[in-house]
Structures are given as C-alpha cells and as structure tokens.
Amino acid sequence: MSAKRSIGDSEILKKRIPQNLKYQHIKTRLDTGNSMTKYLEKIEEIKKNYRYKKDELFKRIKVTTFAQLVLQVASVSEERESGEMTTDELQRLEDNSSVISDTEFLTDRTNGKGSPVNDSKSPIQFIDSERGEECIHTSRSTLQSVISGVGELDLGNQADKKKESLQSSSALDKPYEDCPFLLLDVRDRDSYDQCHVVGAKNYPVAMLSRTMNPFTPEILEYRNAHGKIIILYDEDERIASQAATTMCERGFENLFMLSGGLKVISQKFPQGLTTGSFPVTCLVPPTQMKSALKRTPKDPIVPAEDKWRFSSQDLEMIENHLENMLMSTSTPSRLRMDSRNSKVPSSASSARSQSSTSSHSKPWK
C-alpha cells in the first residue's frame, strides 16, 4: 500500500477534442490573446500568400497601403479638376458679361440688386441654367425666353445631361494627371485582358530580356524621379519578384512590389480595385482547386474594361473594405484596453489603501 493511486486518468489532459471538418473553417469570436495556434496560423497564411526571400533588393508595399494611396490620389485629382473647372467657368462668365448693356448694368446697380456674382452672369445663362435662381428680367432675357420654347429648353437640358454623362465616362478613360505612382502588370497580355488593377499598364516580364530599349518612356520618366514610385504586381509574386530584382539590379531605386498580388487583392478587396474576373488560382486554394471545380459551377468570365480611373462606386467599395478591416483589427485591441482600464482602479485603490496605512503607522514629522 506504499504506492499511491492517482484519482482519475493521468492522460486526461493529453486527450484531444475531436474536430468536425464541417465546422473547421468557422473561427471563434472570443479574443483569448496571443497563442501558439494563432502564431502558426499567421505563419501559414504568410507562406500561402507571400513569398518572402532573404536579401530582397526591392521594397514591398501592402495592399491596404496601396488602397489608401489610391484614395488619396483620387481625392487630390478630383479637387484639382474641380478647381480648374471653377476657374474656367469664371473666365467664361467674365467673357460673356459683355452681353449685358451698360444701361442695364447701371439700373441693376442703382436698384441694389447688383453683386459680383450677378454682374458676371448673362440673361442667356440664367435661362439655360437648371438651378432655381431668379432671372433678371430685361429686354434681351424676355426675347430669349420667347425664342426658346419649353420643349426646346427641355431638349437642351437633356443634351446637357448627356454631355455630362459622356464627360464622366470619358474622364475614366484618361489616367490621373501627375500620378505619384506607376502601376505595372508584369503578366502576359491575355492575363492582363482578363483581370487587372484599374490604372495598371501591361509590361510583360519578357520585355526585360530585350537588348535594345527594354523600358518604355513612362518607366524612364518615373525612374528614380523625386516623389514618384513604380509598383509591380502579378498573381502570386512569382513573376513580379523576378522582374523587381532585375530592375533593381539595373539601377531602379524607387521600385516597389505589391505584396501578395491579385491573390491577396481577391481576399481583401474583391470589388473596387480591379476590373474583370479574377483568375481561378486567386479565388480557390491550390489544394482544394480540383474538388471545388467539380462541385461549384463555373462563373461566366467577364473581360476587363479599358478604364484608367476609379469611379465613385469603386472608391466607395474600397473605403468600405478598408473600414471593415480596420474594425476587425481594432476590436480585440479595444477589448484589451478596456480590460486594462478596468484593472487600473483596483490597483490604484490598493495603492491608496497601502499609502494610507503606512501614513497612519508612521509618525508625522
């Protein structure tokens, strides 16, 4: 009876919980802090989506950083174009202000209705404008209102709306002026026509093998230019890393590679950044590709559009995806901060109680 028998099974802590493959993809919503499983999952994700190598000559840029850069460039170009439009409109209004006669100008000034804005506008502009502003009743304005009937006025407004829609569609066909980055797609032409990032230009990696003129004039313009960078990308960093290494060896210092390529873009920004349909290798993991192709029907492949700017809908989608990612990353940190703040009062009260007891025990000097 010298040997003591333990209560229960000694191997109970080593027993593993059986996992159900049906719910294996579901993650817990409870943040339990850092753990070895999370660390291993992060390493597996890095190995799956990224191809890091030692002593890389080129620099990397994250997909989220690139999305923020796109939003900034779009906002700055929009403000710049709106400023140019206002100056052009003011110049046009100043040129058309000669339509009003001097007597009408003096009568408006004496009646107290004249203002810098009203003085520069002509009666024709008041008639053609769609805004609900009051018209200046002059002989020329009444004559113009008689000449142009209601039907003619509506037709003119519809023509103006069509012109605005054509201008908005034509604006997407032009790249941003003074864009700080040059985005290059180093895949072949067929892959580029299927799917690419909006504003990217096709530069196949085979161009680097040329002995004469391997770089386009745009690449030479952005090469080591102050305040400008060149960004390369592909599907999974296989081609882009080789192209970036070759270009860095040839003297490019402002070269970046988009980390993850289209594979990470399809996961983080499925809509907004790209045009066309993603390749199958970007949507389905390579291990599950065959089984998934057998089960799920093939979606129709949509070719990429020839647009060089992001529309307002694209920018809204990019902002929504960024906000969702920021919210998902900020919630665990907020929970940790709340737990820390809840612990602070208890520690402070204990410190106060200790200081009060020590002050009572020690004599006052």
Swiss-Prot record:
InterPro entries: CEP41 (IPR051889), Rhodanese-like_dom (IPR001763), Rhodanese-like_dom_sf (IPR036873). The keyword Repeat does not apply. One of its GO terms (cellular component) is centrosome. Residues 342-365 have a biased composition (Low complexity). It is found in: Cytoplasm, Cytoskeleton, Microtubule organizing center, Centrosome; Cell projection, Cilium; Cytoplasm, Cytoskeleton, Cilium basal body. Keywords: Cell projection, Ciliopathy, Cilium, Cilium biogenesis/degradation, Cytoplasm, Cytoskeleton, Protein transport, Transport. Its main location: cytoplasm. Residues 177-274 form the Rhodanese domain. GO terms for biological process: cilium assembly; protein polyglutamylation; protein transport. Residues 327-365 are annotated as: Disordered. The keyword Metal-binding does not apply. Required during ciliogenesis for tubulin glutamylation in cilium. Probably acts by participating in the transport of tubulin polyglutamylases between the basal body and the cilium. Belongs to the CEP41 family. This is Centrosomal protein of 41 kDa.
